[in-house]
From Swiss-Prot:
This is Ion-translocating oxidoreductase complex subunit C. Its main location: membrane. It comes from Salmonella paratyphi A (strain AKU_12601). The lineage of its organism: Bacteria, Pseudomonadati, Pseudomonadota, Gammaproteobacteria, Enterobacterales. Its cofactor is [4Fe-4S] cluster. The keyword Iron-sulfur applies. Keywords: 4Fe-4S, Cell inner membrane, Cell membrane, Electron transport, Iron, Iron-sulfur, Membrane, Metal-binding, Repeat, Translocase, Transport.
Amino acid sequence: MLKLFSAFRKDKIWDFDGGIHPPEMKSQSNGTPLRQVPLAPRFVIPLKQHIGAEGELCVSVGDRVLRGQALTRGRGRMLPVHAPTSGTVIAIAPHSTAHPSALAELSVIIDADGEDRWIEREGWSDYRAHSREALIERIHQYGVAGLGGAGFPTGVKLQGGGDKITTLIINAAECEPYITADDRLMQDCAAQIVEGIRILAHILQPREVLIGIEDNKPQAISMLRAVLADAHDISLRVIPTKYPSGGAKQLTQILTGKQVPHGGRSSDIGVLMQNVGTAYAVKRAVVDGEPITERVVTLTGEAISRPGNVWARLGTPVRHLLNDAGFCPSADQMVIMGGPLMGFTLPWLDVPVVKITNCLLAPSVTEMGAPQEEKSCIRCSACADACPADLLPQQLYWFSKGQQHDKATAHHIADCIECGACAWVCPSNIPLVQYFRQEKAEINAIRLEEKRAAEAKARFEARQARLEREKAARLARHKSAAVQPAAKDQDAIAAALARVKEKQAQATQPVVIQAGSLPDNSAVIAAREARKAQARAKQAAHPMADSAISGDDPRKAAVEAAIARAKARKQEQQAGSEPAEPVDPRKAAVEAAIARAKARKQEQQAGSEPAEPVDPRKAAVEAAIARAKARKQEQQAGSEPAEPVDPRKAAVEAAIARAKARKQEQQAGSEPAEPVDPRKAAVEAAIARAKARKQEQQTVSEPVEPADPRKAAVAAAIARVQAKKAAQQQVVNED
């Protein structure tokens, strides 16, 4: 009893809500075997024939290729495409493809050479000896994608399933009217399909493998049952004919009773589905080592004289296939790629066959009926009753027409499979599927823009965070660099500050000198001697090289002599015209001694310096200029008055002069004498004699004012003190 119940549950099938029963129209093409089509002279292979990004080109214009040679590299979801025949690549350029708007996509254009030579093929007849990862990689690199219409890369789908797949479903329903590609493939290649199913089961290791096929394919059912007679790991389930039973979510519910959640995938409930055409392509890729270069395409419709199913090479122009089938176009002929419910009309016939092309329908005008005008929605809810996804098409229609994207998303417009059942039953002839496709495209564009904006914002915030981190790191480095001075440095700073304060305090104290006593300058003298000793030590440690002294120019000497004579004449004239001032003989003697010392020094310097050559013309010019200046000074000197002289100041200056004279004589005796320029000495001597004559004349001509004896005595005493102090200082300096 339990065994009978288990057997009953094993063959149990479920149903889904909605669905329609349109005319099947399959008998036009499923009665003839598969046949080959002659090679087209030119093939157009789009780089993107699947869901995902296009692969990277690995050929260039002018390359010769063989059938099965990879034209692109596949990484990740980038599925490679292969050459459908041998020939030459003549162009790599955009070309219109299988799209409702015939959008241009980058394509490789090949001129066939007619030889149809294959690449070297290496099949894995013992595929069980290879790992799961190696099999998946081979399937991916051989370009196998979902041939049921989605075009999802099979290798990526198998890799994503992982170990959570418990049920493998093979979709053999083929529910849309007119299409018989899978039906004919199962009738002619049932054994190869089953072998491909076993390879998929070996990769996924599911608990059960189910084949779902509609009951309107009796020949295909009988062929599969014959092949599966001895197979107990694969179950064939025959389901009632209802459109769209071939949808992934609908067939999953029919065979397992499980519903795929909104926004989810069948793998979320442990189910993975593959098409029978995909299973056949897997077998050829793994066992035979042949990449996917062709597929079965249904050519049907009353405008075709020889309908049937053919092996069409990928990249073959649609026009070439239709002409081979006896296409008889009318004035307003349309050609549909796909079925009448989910397909789209081609704008022209130069588009190529791709991996998702399963049917080319060329109906007559009477077959499709006259186009009817779109009317307003009457809210009859017939579309909601027919929807297999349990949606509300009338609400989605209003949201799509009113650009209310948020409400359309909230009503699960993404779950629409675009089966066309709602448009089929609509009494107002509203093309609901077109509205839904447009709305989903707009929502996808908005989401893509939001994603880009979010990525840009994330990059901006990351940059700002990085800049803040760098700024904080810089501030931390600056704070660590600003180290407080060590204890010994602080002690040195404190000692320096104490010395400065002590000096300031000493400077502010008043200096008191008692009457009749000399000031005590011993501390100042000691400090000065210490500084002088330090300076002499530095000079001894770092001797400086005397710079070479250029010789005197005779022209300059002549000019200076002329100036000296002019000054002498001026002083003589002043002495003759002005009253003479009294002259101090001591001061005159001091000045004479100073003049003699300077003369000796200049003579020594003149003896060691070479003389430069003198131009006589320039010397004469300069002498004339000097005489002119002297005459001008003589004229100015005649008009200037003389100032009176104070005898007390004269006495003080005489005492200071005597002290300086003694000091200079002592220095001259102890220090090496410097060379003296005789010309400068002569000039200075002349000036000194002129000054002496002037003072003598002033002394004779000017009356002497009577002086106060007390003030004179005080001045003389101060002069003697200063002279003694100067003499002591001189002795100290010599020591």
